Amino acid sequence: MSKPNKFRRIGSLAEFYHAASIPWVATFTLNKRYLHPDYNLTWWKRLRLVFRLWRNTRRIETGTSYKAQAAIAAKLFEIPRAVPGVVVECGCWKGGSTTNLSIISKIAGRSLIVYDSFEGLPDAEEGDRHAKPEAKGLYSGSLETVTSNV
């Protein structure tokens, strides 16, 4: 019996664009001049990290792009290792961002704490500028799904 393929073939021009932009994201979003020297992130290490972020967002559904996650990594890597703190994710849906944040947190030497009600988005309330009533329950997930994906 053949082993299941964990990777999807690039099937659209948009997917090709995202794959082709990996070196650019590694170079410009994770710009070495802004990263703290504690992390010793060479261009090859940054390229590998961005590739892993991209691969995981293709493997596990996530509400954010790998580019947004690379931007989060860039902000985190500006902070010296000696500064105490943890990384917190509020809402993990299926665990795609959690998977990538765990990689980023490990490189940064920080713990990742994840919170989720697994009920999805709440009801829209008066005063919510961008919330839509039909979004209630969107992004609901389960602990089993997250733990199997992370």
Give the ranges of each region predicted by the language model.
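Soluble, non-transmembrane catalytic domains of enzymes that act on hydrophobic metabolites at membranes
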Residues: 1-2
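Poly-acidic low-complexity segments
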Residues: 5-8, 119
